[in-house]
Amino acid sequence: MKENNFFNLDFKFFFVTPYLIWLSFIVFYTFNSESIKAGELDGFIKYGNDSSTYLFYAKNLINFDFSNLDIAKLSYITLIAVVMFLKLNLTTVIILQFLTTIISSFCLYLIGKKIFSKWVGLICLSLFLTYLPIQLRNFYLLTEMLFINFSIILTYLVFFKKEKKILILLMTIFVLFLRPQSFLILLSIALSIVLFSKFNKNYNFILKLFIIFFFSFLLLIFTYIGINYYNLTDSLSKGMIWGYSFETNSLCYKECISGLTNPSIYEKNIFGLLLYVKDNFFILTKVSIYKIILYFSGWRPYYSFAHNVFILCFHIPIYFLFCVYFLRLKKFDPFEIFTLFYVLISAIFIGVTFADWSGRYIMYILPFMMLYASKSLFNLLLILKDQLNTKK
């Protein structure tokens, strides 16, 4: 039985099984969403807090009204606008999200297969399709699911299909304007290419310089937007989770962290931000650590005990297996460098901004962590198999 024979009958059965489970979940949820707290569908769609905003901007876009347009989410707004212009049902967007989930899951499998083996790819594929918090996002008229899917597809193309230059360029532009955090994954890809190019002569000097300057420029733009449009100085005072006070276990609108100086007295520029951080360094450092813990754990004080336990029971093994893989590693390939950068930069980003209400930000990096956790799990299964064979 050859390892690389994809069309082996036994493997075909194992490969299809995660998709059958995934499809069963979709059907079950579609017809039973009303029995899940805050999960009821409107037809085939789950509307989030920002859905109405996207619809509003999409209608404006159709009417060539570009005032107050959210550039950071322009790709998703444009997609909705096209669907509305063609007079298609909004369910079309949800169907597209499901289709891209199928494609991205297959790309995860291919990445696992190329780096390790088809069985590692299969384990990663299974983890991705059966992790319900991510898959539930397919039903939401929000940017998250497309961002997760296109991030996976883009990284597959960049690292394993470099010849698809036009497709990579188009997808990079689409991802860049899909979510405000899009620069994190693009920056991670760029850094991994630049760093790996020091050990690989295939990347020329001009390409390396272009990547450095291009993403330095992007970083400056996003820093400017963060300070002026999103008011980062004020954001730092809004708590570990935006607008939630852990001291009172309730919403807060002004001071969510006690002991901070008034952010309104600082100028809205990089110097004002740095001065604010200096004046509140110890409090902000402690809060940043808490934010990162909240980010990785997925635990939220307002979620049910069962929900928090479910999340922790999935996250902790994934993180443990992920760390086991990299602690044993002595030499890094480009995709490993990218993954480490993406995880690290994302954690830092949360530390200096805020953890989100629903825990969805961790979903952006989880598929890549699942990949290396799958390799550790596969190695563990091989050890168990050898021990069982030895006893026989």
Could you say what each language-model-derived stretch is?
Residues 96-100, 123-153, 158, 175-185, ...:
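Multi-pass, polyprenyl lipid-linked donor-dependent membrane glycosyltransferases
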Residues 95-115, 153, 317-325:
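Transmembrane-helix motifs of polytopic, lipid-linked glycan transferases
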Residues 105-130, 148, 338:
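Transmembrane-helix signature of polytopic, membrane-embedded enzymes
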Residues 91-92, 276-345:
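Membrane-interface anchor segments at the N-terminal boundary of transmembrane helices
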Residues 1-36, 198, 203-218, 335:
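Start-transfer (signal-anchor) and selected internal transmembrane alpha helices
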Residues 165-180, 186-191, 219:
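Membrane-interface alpha helices of multi-pass inner-membrane proteins
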Residues 50-91, 287-295:
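Short hydrophobic/aromatic helix or loop-helix immediately within or flanking a transmembrane segment
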